[in-house]
């Protein structure tokens, strides 16, 4: 993540984000970020975040290094989260997978708002796991503030509210009206600059959404986008699909770098993640409809149910709201599929009755990690 910062992608958007951060420090407060792919302005939090390194230097390598450091912090947070909720063994496996994954590295070293999602998502998940074990109002406030920051980093995070609400209902979260109101006020407070911009501009930018021509829900193009978004969720959690980033030179790169064997292991990761998703989706449905006692349910099971709700309901929302299929729209799902794949692998290792099977599974993990590092 911190190596070869001189070959990072740095084009107009990256320059404009640094420019906004610089203006925020030296000129006037930044109220909005850059326009999104649908024309709606991003909220300004990413510019505020970049103002930390920009206050020292505007060198693209330095600012990108800051983003990479944030993501290294994200790996540490992932270790804490996985160890606390699941096990030490799973924590090491999932951190190894994320640390070496080509796509995860790609989305951790660029001056781009989606590249900063992972550490904030993990702080949110850690706080949520703590709340499930010991509910307090203060943790609700922290989660509300984190959601305000996460939704500012990328608008796809707005679709998190559906699965989170359903999850809160399922686990019968002891939310008081007071805590919800305070959390809502904190959320609104962190959106004050963005709201201010829209008020002083008579909400002209918001009118763009109503004027956009979008396909109908059940049109062929929207169905194709929905399917592609599901594919991208799994592709960017493996090493497949790198042709999207390497472009026209990918075929030559593929042949000259002998990528056939690594792609076999990438496909295995993709298959295990897909299998794990189906497995935990079925388990979640059974658990919900059997009306198990949630107080006696392990935190790890609750978190896996939340993850399946996020995967299912967010992709349903992508379909209903006609979200175009782009890989960075699926960074919001990090590190869910890595955890699911690691859980399947660790469970298989525990249940293996033969030392040969256990050694084979360890060898497979090592081959996957080596393939990740080789391609990276």
What does each of the following model-derived ranges do?
Residues 166, 185-188, 345-376:
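Signature aromatic-anchored transmembrane alpha helix within multi-pass, membrane-resident enzymes
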Residues 11, 103-115, 155:
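Short acidic/glycine- and proline-prone juxtamembrane loop motifs at membrane-interface regions
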Residues 107-108, 117, 302-349:
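Hydrophobic/aromatic-rich transmembrane helices and adjacent perimembrane loops
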Residues 17-23, 158-289, 300:
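Transmembrane-lumen/periplasm boundary regions of multi-pass, lipid-linked membrane glycan transferases
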Residues 61, 65-86, 122-123, 127, ...:
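Transmembrane-helix motifs of polytopic, lipid-linked glycan transferases
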Residues 84-86, 124-142, 150:
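Membrane-interface transmembrane helices that cradle and orient dolichyl/undecaprenyl
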């Amino acid at each position: 993540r911190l190596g070869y910062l001189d070959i990072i992608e740095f084009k107009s958007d990256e320059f404009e984000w640094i420019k906004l951060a610089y203006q925020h420090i030296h000129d006037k407060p930044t109220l909005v970020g850059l326009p999104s792919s649908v024309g709606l302005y991003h909220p300004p939090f990413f510019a505020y975040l970049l103002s930390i390194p920009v206050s020292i230097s505007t060198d693209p390598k330095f600012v990108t290094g800051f983003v990479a450091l944030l993501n290294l912090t994200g790996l540490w947070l992932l270790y804490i989260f996985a160890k606390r909720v699941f096990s030490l063994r799973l924590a090491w496996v999932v951190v190894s997978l994320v640390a070496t994954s080509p796509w995860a590295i790609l989305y951790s070293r660029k001056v781009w708002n989606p590249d900063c999602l992972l550490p904030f998502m993990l702080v949110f998940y850690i706080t949520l796991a703590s709340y499930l074990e010991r509910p307090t109002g203060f943790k609700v406030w922290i989660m509300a503030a984190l959601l305000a920051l996460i939704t500012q980093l990328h608008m796809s995070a707005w679709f998190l509210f559906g699965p989170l609400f359903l999850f809160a209902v399922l686990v019968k979260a002891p939310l008081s009206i007071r805590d919800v109101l305070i959390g809502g006020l904190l959320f609104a407070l962190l959106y004050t600059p963005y709201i201010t911009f829209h008020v002083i501009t008579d909400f002209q930018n918001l009118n763009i959404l109503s004027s956009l021509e979008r396909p109908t829900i059940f049109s062929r193009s929207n169905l194709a986008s929905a399917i592609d978004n599901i594919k991208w969720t799994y592709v960017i959690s493996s090493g497949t699909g790198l042709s999207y980033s390497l472009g026209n030179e990918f075929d030559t790169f593929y042949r000259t770098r002998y990528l056939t064997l690594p792609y076999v292991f990438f496909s295995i990761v993709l298959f295990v993640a897909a299998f794990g998703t189906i497995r935990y989706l079925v388990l979640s449905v059974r658990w919900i409809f059997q009306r198990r006692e949630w107080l006696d349910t392990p935190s790890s099971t609750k978190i896996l149910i939340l993850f399946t709700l996020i995967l299912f309901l967010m992709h349903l929302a992508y379909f209903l709201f006609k979200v175009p299929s782009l890989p960075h729209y699926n960074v919001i799902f990090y590190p869910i599929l890595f955890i699911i794949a690691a859980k399947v692998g660790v469970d298989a290792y525990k249940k293996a009755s033969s030392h040969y099977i256990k050694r084979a599974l360890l060898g497979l993990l090592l081959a996957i990690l080596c393939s990740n590092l080789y391609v990276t």
